[in-house]
Regions:
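C-terminal domain-boundary segment and adjacent tail
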Residues: 36-44, 196-276
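Short glycine-enriched, charge-decorated loop/helix-capping segments at active-site entrances
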Residues: 20-24, 85-86, 234-241
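A general structural detector for well-ordered alpha-helical segments in enzyme core domains, enriched
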Residues: 29-33, 59, 63, 91, ...
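Metal-dependent polysaccharide deacetylase catalytic core of the NodB/CE4 family, i.e.
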Residues: 3-4, 16, 40-121, 130-131, ...
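Active-site-adjacent pocket scaffolds in enzyme catalytic domains
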Residues: 105-214
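Alpha-helical scaffolding within the catalytic cores
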Residues: 30-31, 53-64, 157-167
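N-terminal regions that are enriched for targeting/export leaders
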Residues: 1-35
């Protein structure tokens, strides 16, 4: 069965938690990414942090006109799963309203900052009418302040699934979890552009074959699209190695991947999951 690759972009500030207010990736990298996607005819889903939406209306308009998918990436990049339910719900509501005011379509996809979701988060999303969550990264866990558990996705299912008990809901009103794909070259990390920049596109194409699941969510961050060393030399080398202002390797990956998989979007995956 042919594998499906969903290119998924977290539109956020540069190196959250390490750099304060960096926007180089959004301002320089995302426009280049849009040109590349148009050139190779690959669709993508863009998950927006609220501050980016309000600060860059021209970019918002360009992505909307290109008819890429639009998702919510939260108010900021603080962990959501460590907050009380009432706070989680209010933050999701506020970020939803910001996207509703900026885009012609209502946002129905969500990705928590830093993959920080739990069952409470997922229940809130379902209650608020979200159709898709793509926050869970199987194989990953995180601690707050290196001590307090924030989330643990190590045993999470790797294929699309309903994460919240059904109750009396019909399938078409339930939240579908479409997990981010774990990178077989670096367990616990996401498969995405950072891996191409760090290991080369050929190794990432090989990694696609190593992944057992049929649906792959391929993650892109804005700061991976720029020469981050020139702007943020104090960022750890492991993160800088995942960045490049030359999208040539990404272009070659997209071409090579098309020979072994098809490109899709998260809404299309949901439609297929529901039998539509």
């Amino acid at each position: 069965m042919t594998k499906r690759i969903c290119v998924s972009v977290d539109v956020e500030e540069d190196f959250p938690g390490l750099v304060k207010g960096g926007r180089r990736g959004v301002e320089e990298g995302i426009p280049e990414l849009l040109r590349l996607l148009e050139d190779v005819h690959v669709p993508a889903d863009f998950f927006f942090q609220s501050s980016i939406v309000t600060e860059h209306p021209d970019l918002v308009s360009r992505i909307a006109k290109a008819k890429h998918g639009i998702g919510n990436h939260g108010l900021n990049h603080a962990f959501l799963s460590t907050k009380p339910p009432a706070v989680q719900k209010e933050e999701i509501r506020r970020s939803t309203r910001i996207l509703e005011n900026a885009f012609p379509q209502e946002p129905r996809m969500f990705r928590a900052a830093g993959f920080s979701t739990n069952l409470v988060t997922l229940e809130i999303l379902q209650d608020l009418g979200y159709a898709i969550d793509s926050s869970i990264l199987p194989g990953r866990r995180a601690k707050r302040f290196r001590v307090l558990p924030a989330y643990d996705h190590r045993a999470a299912p790797r294929d699309p699934h309903f994460p919240v008990p059904s109750g009396d809901r019909s399938a078409d009103t339930r939240l579908l979890e479409i997990p981010v794909t774990e990178n077989p070259l670096r367990r616990g990390g996401p498969l995405g552009l950072g891996a191409i920049n760090a290991y080369g596109f050929d190794k990432v194409v090989t990694a696609i074959h190593a992944v057992e699941e049929r649906t792959l969510v391929f993650l892109v961050h804005p700061w991976e699209l720029i020469d981050a060393r020139a702007y943020y030399p104090k960022v750890p080398e492991g993160l800088l190695a995942a960045c490049s202002g030359d999208l040539g390797a990404f272009r070659e990956f997209l071409k090579a991947a098309r020979a072994v998989a098809e490109f899709s979007t998260l809404p299309n995956v949901r439609r297929g999951f529901l039998g539509g």
